[in-house]
Amino acid sequence: MAMEGYRGFLGLLVSALLVGFLSVIFVLIWVLHFREGLGWDGGALEFNWHPVLAVTGFVFIQGIAIIVYRLPWTWKCSKFLMKSIHAGLNAVAAILAIISVVAVFDYHNVRKIPHMYSLHSWVGLTVLILYIQQLVVGFFIFLLPWAPPSLRAIVMPIHVYSGLLLFGTVIATVLMGVTEKLFFVLKNPSYHSFPPEGVFTNTLGLLILVFGALIFWIVTRPQWKRPREPGSIPLQLNGGNADGMEGAIAISSAHNMDAADAELSSEGAARKRTLGLVDTGQRSTM
């Protein structure tokens, strides 16, 4: 099936990948050039893993996971395969985010810095916990086969909304963290005097913001939604489409065949009962 507005989609996709990749490169340059590199010794070099892993996993990889269903080259792949890829990318993002938080706690423990005192830390830890919860719920309800279709229809709009909300909150949290870090480390020259590190890192923040905007635009265009698989029917609640943005939750064709077989069986039984009654009536009149 051809995608409507394919050239526009391709242009935005390439732009998103380019900007996201540049964001990862910029955060690496920031910590390697301006912040003395990476390490795992409880010092500042260990803390530097925090922005690197947060931008790479929680921003870039999560953004790709959000739009993976919309890649038209994957529409011939099974829905289960795409669900597995979506879940796998989100799992990688969660693991990298967890490691980034561990690096911060180690750094604070070694330096005797209080934990969880800033708004950045409050929002960041909250969104990480909710992200892991979202991943676990999605795994058990959408990836594993035993959840009833009615439950999937109820949860899907919540899953889509909360996923986008968490992604937007992650971007806001990263921008808060970048600004907070610059205020802490830029003393001479100070942040407000436009030092090279400040200008460079502000550019990183703009790249992250643009990447998020491109992902939001791609995932909210209805004409770029993955089409339903042949032989499937959408589940609807109260007359509404229950699938949110990424295609209707569908009953498989095997289920449809089972339902059809059951209907034919019931019709056959009804015909037999009718013939039996007719036969009985004929016998009573003979």
Swiss-Prot record:
InterPro entries: CYB561/CYBRD1-like, Cyt_b561/ferric_Rdtase_TM. Residues 33-47, 106-118, 180-197 are extracellular. The modification Phosphothreonine is found at T285. It is found in: Cell membrane; Apical cell membrane. Keywords: Cell membrane, Electron transport, Heme, Iron, Membrane, Metal-binding, Oxidoreductase, Phosphoprotein, Translocase, Transmembrane, Transmembrane helix, Transport. The modification Phosphoserine is found at S232. It catalyses: Fe(3+)(out) + L-ascorbate(in) = monodehydro-L-ascorbate radical(in) + Fe(2+)(out) + H(+); Cu(2+)(out) + L-ascorbate(in) = Cu(+)(out) + monodehydro-L-ascorbate radical(in) + H(+); monodehydro-L-ascorbate radical(out) + L-ascorbate(in) = monodehydro-L-ascorbate radical(in) + L-ascorbate(out). Heme b 1 binds at H50, H115, M116, Y117, S118, H120, E180. One of its GO terms (biological process) is ascorbate homeostasis. PROSITE patterns: CYTOCHROME_B561. Binds 2 heme b groups non-covalently. One of its GO terms (molecular function) is identical protein binding. Residues 15-220 form the Cytochrome b561 domain. L-ascorbate binds at K79, K83, R152. Its cofactor is heme b. Its EC number is 7.2.1.3. This is Plasma membrane ascorbate-dependent reductase CYBRD1. It comes from Rattus norvegicus (Rat). The gene is Cybrd1.
